[in-house]
Amino acid sequence: MAEPAILGGPKAMPDGMIKAWPPIYDLDRQYVLASLESDSHAFGPNCAKLEEEFAAWNGNKFAITTNSGTAALHMAVAACGVGAGDHVLVTAYSWSSSATCIIHHNALPVFVDIDFNTINIDPDKIEAAITPRTKAIIVVHLHGLAVDMDKVMAIARKHNLKVIEDACQAHGALFHGKRVGAMGDCAAFSFNQNKCLCSGEGGMFVTDNEEIANAARQIWSFGETRTPLEKRDYHAYALGWMYRKNGLTPTFGRGQLTRMDEYLARSRENTAVLLKSLAGVKGLIVPTQPEGFLHNWYNFTSRIDMEALGWTGEPAVMRDAIMQGIQAEGVPVGIWQSYILPAMTVFQAKNAYGFGCPWSCQHGSDIPEYDPAQFPKAQRHCDTHFGMTSPLRAPHGADVAEAVGEAFRKVFENAEKLPGLPDRERPARA
């Protein structure tokens, strides 16, 4: 095998081989142009059509378009009756919105460590984290792999807790044949640039519970009870926000939704090619898909086995050297999150709104502690991971997946020679 590109060898991935995501087709253009020629560009019929079509595709009774997945998460927390001082359990490793949505409604996040193999919340650690103030559990189907929902739902029903699915990355992922977003009490999806369903920006709130749907709709539009498509009385019946989606971007999302199943199939085909190519690579921990789960492969996230490489220094130093080596091969890998959630300043400072609120709220009790050392598996993952999104998606085929595999192999097989490693800690060649 040739030398890594970072050491002077040829690139595994030729320039121009990786295309932009998402692919744009004539139907997308037709929908968008038709919207531009309409009389309204705010929330309107295009949003309602996307709601109907997405609900049918995902198997939900109710769907509400939002301007982001973050907005949909806040709506979920509020609609589930979470209030001041309540506790909501959430994974210690995710995007910040998975936990800050709890603070948005004056409640307190309680973090739970991950299962290192799945990178998702460890269901076996959930029950120990429940307190008398716990009101809900947010499960994040991270990088497109579902959480073990049988275990989560059993715990939730035992303790009378609501379950919110953060499915922002998991469109089309399955758990024992059931789609994510259709197993808990409600769920949030994101449609931003990188997601498997892209409308530029935006999101979707979904539920099968009419009471929860009505509560979410109030939060969504100024505390009102009627949508902009109905005769509004412009009366705020509750505290509300403005989380509505505009009328243009849903048209793009509708066009993309017609190809979602095709996109997912392509990602799964390409990932199978890549996993076969990476079998037996020393020091590489590839992502898992347990029996009964169907991944959507939103983010192909790998970890590095430092012990297997003989590396005794800081894990992030070796991770960064390997990542830079793969980038030099033309493969756009990167770090997804540099900090676990409990280590982020907003939680360490416990001062979201000033004066220590909401942690200092008079309605709060059993104030959680956010010591990062309590979440060793999340920290280990954070320090050793790198991932990628677009190379395994449409319009790419097996040739791109094979080039990615070659890039990984070249770099891992020459890990001891990579630049950026201190000589005194550089692993010996096996």
Predicted features along the sequence, with ranges:
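Conserved PLP-binding active-site segment in aminotransferase class I/II-type PLP enzymes
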Residues: M1-M75, A79, G83, R157, ...
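Short glycine/proline-enriched loop/turn "hinge" motifs that connect secondary-structure elements
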Residues: P23-I24, G240-R244, Q374-C382
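PLP-dependent aminotransferase-like
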Residues: A78-A167, L174
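Basic phosphate/pyrophosphate-binding loop/patch that engages nucleotide-derived ligands
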Residues: I130, A154-K162, M204-F222, A316-V317, ...
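Active-site region of PLP-dependent enzymes
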Residues: A170-H176, M183-S302
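Conserved PLP cofactor-binding pocket of PLP-dependent enzymes
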Residues: G223-R232, L278, R319-G387, E416-R429
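Conserved PLP-binding active-site segment of the aspartate aminotransferase-like
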Residues: P287-E291, W297-T312, P332-G354, D383-D399
